[in-house]
Structure formats: structure tokens, C-alpha cells
Amino acid sequence: MSASFDRYVSFQHCDWEGRSERVMQRLQRHVEAAENPFWAYFAQKRAELRDKQGLDDLRILHNYLPTLRELLEDNGDLETLEMLEDLEANLM
């Protein structure tokens, strides 16, 4: 089998990359605020998973979904939480 497999073929017209990036941009504010040690860990793991394993932001968000949801709720960041839940419901 020489053709590569695109696991996101069904998301072709859903702008999953743009939507994931917008969530990551909003999460960056939490990373920079450094109010919880998880955020530094998350930023480090994101870089590692992207660089070493080639994972995209949608997959990384999926990997940390329960923790992200809890922290966003605790921080009252309901807009980012809503964006994350939309990704989960429609693309994960």
C-alpha cells in the first residue's frame, strides 16, 4: 500500500486545523499566565508531540480533553470551553 492515509478526510470542509489553532491560541493565555503547573507541562508536551510524533493540535487537544475541560471550567473561561466542546462534538 503506497498511498498515504488521511485520517481527516471526513473533516475536509470543516476547517479542523483553523478551529484547533484558535483553541490553542486561547489556551496560550493560560500557559502565559502560569497560574497552574499543568499549563507549562501542556505546552512542553504539545511541542514534543508535534515535533517527535507529528501529532496535530486536534489530536493533542483530544489527548488532554478532560483536564482542559476541568481547568477551563475552574478558570471561568467558558468561551474557550465552548470552542473545545464544539471540537469534541463535531471533530473528535
Curated annotation (Swiss-Prot):
The keyword Ubl conjugation does not apply. One of its GO terms (biological process) is nitrogen fixation. Keywords: Nitrogen fixation. InterPro entries: CowN (IPR024899). It comes from the Bacteria. Is required to sustain N(2)-dependent growth in the presence of low levels of carbon monoxide (CO). Probably acts by protecting the N(2) fixation ability of the nitrogenase complex, which is inactivated in the presence of CO. HAMAP family: CowN. Belongs to the CowN family. NCBIfam families: N2Fix_CO_CowN. This is N(2)-fixation sustaining protein CowN. The lineage of its organism: Bacteria, Pseudomonadati, Pseudomonadota, Alphaproteobacteria, Hyphomicrobiales. The gene is cowN.
